[in-house]
Every structure is written in structure tokens, then in C-alpha cells.
From Swiss-Prot:
It catalyses: cytidine(2498) in 23S rRNA + S-adenosyl-L-methionine = 2'-O-methylcytidine(2498) in 23S rRNA + S-adenosyl-L-homocysteine + H(+). It comes from Pseudomonas savastanoi pv. phaseolicola (strain 1448A / Race 6). InterPro entries: RlmM_FDX (IPR040739), RlmM_THUMP-like (IPR048646), RNA_MeTrfase_FtsJ_dom (IPR002877), rRNA_MeTrfase_M (IPR011224), SAM-dependent_MTases_sf (IPR029063). This is Ribosomal RNA large subunit methyltransferase M. The active site is at K300. Keywords: Cytoplasm, Methyltransferase, rRNA processing, S-adenosyl-L-methionine, Transferase. GO terms for cellular component: cytoplasm. Catalyzes the 2'-O-methylation at nucleotide C2498 in 23S rRNA. HAMAP family: 23SrRNA_methyltr_M. S-adenosyl-L-methionine binds at S183, A216, P217, G218, G219, D235, D255, D271. The lineage of its organism: Bacteria, Pseudomonadati, Pseudomonadota, Gammaproteobacteria, Pseudomonadales. Gene3D superfamilies: 3.30.2300.20, 3.30.70.2810, Vaccinia Virus protein VP39 (3.40.50.150). It is an enzyme of class 2 (transferase). Belongs to the class I-like SAM-binding methyltransferase superfamily. RNA methyltransferase RlmE family. RlmM subfamily.
Length: 357
């Protein structure tokens, strides 16, 4: 099991290869990354048998930017019939697992395999349980089968608490009909990724205040209002009337890059389409000057050297806070609902909660 298999957004295979190669080098795991363009997946081939396991044990999955999901294991060719027997034979060297996910890559060809996986899962699950390879124990590793076709599958393992929270890393979020734009799903997914669900009532509570920079028509504002927050929406464009009618939104016609609140707020969110360095500077200003406690900001990516640019900006942000003597946590992820962008979440660790509304 010396191969680390990773899912990603189509077109970002090179970024996954660059990122995982950096982490492997830091952990002294020898190997090489490979991928084909627009296949929505990449591999890191370790030269040592335990390399993939050491890499996964030494790296938190939720700290990775571009991979959506990962698993260590091997590829297996399947016959046209009796696939289950072949899979069971190969799994003899695998430990018993506590859960089973059947996955496909995020391409048109991959999506065509979804129905096959749905039909195949029940008999496979039954066979695995009868063989003692699948038990009801969340502490045990997760068995991940990624089907490249009906004749090829990647048999993989991952710790349930150190891998994606959804199959393939794709959230099943429902678009709210009353939301003004589909961008609302980006912020909802960001909260799922960056904030543990059992902390939502504390960190996304109805007695908080927020600012949405570049708010119109209000996709991100909607998520704040949905949590009951009092929101200041900054944009020269019009806001959705449905949001204004809630009485929770104050709309100010102003420049999102120059606006500053009179009093600190709990949340700042921003999805302005601008050069990533300008949006990154907003994070430094708002968190560094204590204007907010937490922030979610999208960084639009350049056409080339995307991982290198994101890494450079994150390093600059971290160095800036260190120079200020400000303690923050920094997270960054290319979410499923992101396109040519990544989403950053920052949280100050040394300021009190803003005054309640």
C-alpha cells in the first residue's frame, strides 16, 4: 500500500502534486507525484512500503488546500463478473474497517459510474461483513473504494477523523430557494469545513454581528442572517429585498476595501472578485487591528503557479501576524463550491467576543 490517491477539482491535479510533494519532503517520505490533466485525481507513489501511511499519519488532512479526499492503498483490475471475490481476496492483507465508502472521481466519466456504485454497495457491504472486514466501530479505519471504471478500482484506507467528512469530499448541501445567489453555498460549506459542528451555536450564534464586504446581492449575507446575526452589508450594488425585509441587514454604499466598522464585530466575510493579494491584505487588516474575531475571505487564483501563489500569500499573512504579536489560526481550502479560487478562514485567539447587538 505505497500509493496515496487523492481526489481534487478537475484542472487542479498539478496543484495537488505540488502540495503533497512539499508535505512529503517535510516528513522525509520519499516518492513522486503524478497525474494526468483534467482527471480530478492525483497520486503520490512512495518508494518505501510504509511511506503513504507515514505521510497520512504526519499530515492533518484538513490542513491540505487542494486535495478533496485521500486514501492509501493500491489499484486493482477487476473481471467483468464476480468482482466481489477478487476484492475480498485483495483485502485479506487489509485490517478490519469501521465504515465503507464507494467513490468516483469528479468527471463526466466518473459520474456515469455512480449508479453502478449504488447497486454494487449493498452486496459488497454484506460480503465484507460476512468476511469480518467491515465492523461497526468508528475507531477503525475507513475503507474507500474509488472506481476509475467498472474494471478498475483503487482499494484505499483512511482514518475517519483524518480524511474528508463527505464521500469524495463533496458536500451534500441544498440550495435555499430564498437565497439571492448560489454563492451562498460557498460560505455554508466553509463553515462545515472550518468550524466543528458542535461549536456552531457558540461561534455562529444569533447574538453576533457581522460585516459582508462586496455583499450584493446577498448570497453570503443570507448565511449570516440565517444564523440570526445583525449584518452590515457593504456594496455599491443593490441588495435583495428579501434580506432587507428581515430587519437584520444595514446596507451601506461604500468601498469594501476602505470600509471599517466603528466597533469590532464578530465576523467579516468577503467574496470580492479582486487580485488575491488585495483580499489577503483585508485579512491582515481586519484581524490584525481587531476589527473582527473571525473571517472568511475568498482568494481568486492566477492562471499559473496557483499553489505557489497561495502558499506565498499564506506565509505572508502568517508572518504579518507574528510581527504584530497577534495570535490567529489560519485555514485555507479549495472548497467544492469554489472554482478558480480558495477560501481562507482566520480566527483571532486573543480577543474577547464583540459586544452583543
Amino acid at each position: 500500500m505505497n500509493t496515496l490517491f487523492m481526489h481534487c477539482r478537475p484542472g487542479f491535479e498539478g496543484e495537488v502534486c505540488s502540495e503533497i510533494s512539499d508535505h512529503a519532503a517535510c516528513l522525509d517520505v520519499a516518492g513522486y507525484a503524478k497525474a494526468r490533466p483534467d482527471t480530478a485525481c492525483a497520486e503520490f507513489i512512495c518508494t518505501e512500503a510504509d511511506g503513504a501511511e507515514r505521510l497520512m499519519n504526519g499530515q492533518r488532512f484538513d490542513a491540505l488546500i487542494f486535495p478533496r479526499q485521500w486514501a492509501r492503498g493500491m489499484f486493482l483490475e477487476l473481471p467483468e463478473t464476480d468482482r466481489i471475490s477478487v476484492i475480498l481476496a485483495q483485502l485479506s492483507a487489509f485490517p478490519a474497517c469501521g465504515s465503507l465508502w464507494l467513490e468516483v472521481v469528479d468527471t463526466n466519466d466518473g459520474k456515469e459510474l455512480s449508479n453502478f456504485c449504488k447497486k454494487f454497495e449493498a452486496p459488497l457491504r454484506k460480503a465484507l461483513m460476512q468476511a469480518g472486514k467491515l465492523v461497526d466501530d468508528p475507531r477503525k479505519p475507513r475503507l474507500l473504494l474509488t472506481f476509475k471504471s467498472g474494471r478498475e478500482v483503487f482499494l484505499g484506507l483512511a482514518d475517519a477523523d483524518n480524511s474528508a467528512m463527505w464521500p469524495m469530499g463533496i458536500p451534500r448541501l441544498k440550495f435555499p430557494r430564498e437565497a439571492p445567489s448560489r454563492s451562498t453555498l460557498k460560505l455554508e460549506e466553509a463553515w462545515h469545513h472550518f468550524i466543528p459542528r458542535d461549536q456552531w451555536d457558540e461561534r455562529l450564534s444569533g447574538d453576533m454581528t457581522g460585516v459582508d464586504l462586496g455583499a450584493a446581492p446577498g448570497g453570503w449575507t443570507y448565511q449570516l442572517v440565517r444564523r440570526g446575526m445583525l449584518v452590515t452589508a457593504i456594496d455599491n450594488g443593490p441588495m435583495a429585498e428579501s434580506l432587507m425585509d428581515t430587519g437584520l441587514v444595514q446596507h451601506l454604499m461604500a468601498d469594501g476595501f476602505t470600509y471599517k466598522p466603528r466597533h469590532p464585530v464578530d465576523w467579516m466575510v468577503c467574496d470580492i472578485v479582486e487580485k488575491p493579494a488585495r483580499n489577503a491584505a483585508l485579512l491582515e487588516t481586519w484581524l490584525g487591528e481587531g476589527l473582527c474575531r473571525e473571517a472568511v475571505v475568498n482568494l481568486k487564483l492566477p492562471m499559473k503557479q496557483r499553489y505557489a501563489e497561495v502558499r506565498r500569500l499564506l506565509d505572508r499573512i502568517e508572518e504579518g501576524f507574528q510581527a504584530r504579536g497577534v495570535r490567529v489560526s489560519i485555514g485555507c481550502k479549495q472548497l467544492y463550491h469554489d472554482r478558480e479560487e480558495v477560501t481562507c478562514h482566520l480566527r483571532r485567539l486573543d480577543v474577547a467576543k464583540a459586544a452583543t447587538k
